[in-house]
Amino acid sequence: MNDTFMKEKPVFPLILSMALPMVISMLVNSLYNIVDSFFVAQISENAMTALSLVYPIQNFANAIAIGFGIGISAQIAICLGAGNKETASKAATHGLALSALHGVLLTIGCILVMPGFLVLFTSDADVIDLGIRYSTIVFLFATINTTNLSYEKIFQGVGKMKVTMIGLMVGCVSNIILDPLLIFGIGPFPAMGIEGAAIATGLGQVFNLVFYLIVYKIQPLQVRLSRKYLHPDKALIARLYSVGIPGALNLALPSVLVSALNGLLAAYSQSYVVILGIYYKLQTFLYLPASGIVQGMRPVIGYNYGAGEHKRVKKIYYVTLCMSGVIMLVGTIICLTVPGQLMGMFTTNPETIAAGKMALRIICAGFLVSSVSVTACGALEGLGRGTASLVVSLCRYLIIILPAAFILSSVLGAVGVWHAFWIAEALTAGVAFFISQKVIGV
């Protein structure tokens, strides 16, 4: 990444070139999650249940690692934009060291917490045993994972999006290959069942990290990791956490929302819980291109902000907003025209499909306007304004949608929950625009 490339290349092709690798990476990761679940489901239903119960804690650990990584990436991009390579290198070194420490703490904490956590959700001794066996191995690799994600965000911070794309693909593809070999004992490998799935996940992370280490050694970067930068810089650490903590909470909030809405919908019918689950599976793919664009925008907007290119910062924001808006408009059209086919991909129950069609058509009314809050969150994180980004996410996932869902469901029944989605998106867009205007001056 050089000054000419980041400061002078036309904004649209620049963001597109940064975003496309991210979109591909996220698609590969989504495919991996589906394939991994498929292989575990072949072991037994209890194994799949155990995997599902462990997932929230895995998601929590990943949220911490990725959220802090966003803070690393933001500081690197801003410092490089300001021409301060020394501070950028110090941010990368501090971030990597702290990420490794987070991994050690997560290993200890998650392994200790898991038995008690599983007991909260099931009394089946076999499921608990499978969950403990799987999670213990997975969390032994936590330091590898946090270090891995730290390198990923360092590469993103300097604009090496293709490197992170290839790295993620190396990890995911190796995991997909190893899953059947280690789970079922193909060839020279012993059959290890659910432990095999956990080892495959860990080895995928190892291969990913090895790839990043090789690239770091052979490819010159504008930041260097060095022991001389390890002396604690309290102000820099505070800046890393000022984005990292809100970033982690932003990633964890959707899980909190789903849990709350599941409890609300279960009072009406279990089929509504199924519909919500299907919607979030679909949402992953519908929002994926927009999320990739926002990820690609983060280092670009941070770099230009650090360089004092304020007019270009505004242009980057608006181009990203328009790109996200077009994608969400396409998603809206798809949900309005073929909702039955979308629901039919995940269930064959006619009643669930009929109710799901209505749900999709109501929820998608908020897709287009949601591009405002999605873009604002990414821009604010890229500018190092983590707290402002968290305020937008809190409005979107808790403060507005939950009261709206409770009030509307008491009047309209379960359908009221679906209306709460677009209402929350519309009101949050107003909050996001107001905050963006104050911070960015859009």
Question: Which positions does each model-derived feature cover?
Answer:
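Short alpha-helical transmembrane segments in multi-pass integral membrane proteins
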Residues: M1-A19, I76-T143, F189-I245, I301-G366, ...
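Short runs within selected transmembrane alpha-helices of multi-pass transporters and secretion channels
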Residues: G69, V138-Q156, T164-C172, A197-Y212, ...
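Hydrophobic transmembrane alpha-helices of multi-pass small-molecule transporters
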Residues: F60-A63, T107, N175-P180, L209-L213, ...
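Helix-terminus/linker motif at the lipid-water interface of multi-pass membrane proteins
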Residues: L27, L31-T49, L118-A125, L181-M192, ...
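Structural signal for membrane-spanning alpha-helices in multi-pass inner-membrane proteins
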Residues: C110, K153, D179, I183, ...
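Transmembrane helical elements of multi-pass membrane transporters/channels
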Residues: S17-D36, I137, G171, G204-N208, ...
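Small-residue-rich hydrophobic transmembrane alpha-helices
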Residues: M48-I108, N145-G159, V163-T164, N262, ...
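Residue-level signal for short hydrophobic patches within transmembrane helices
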Residues: E8, F12-L31, V35, I57-I64, ...
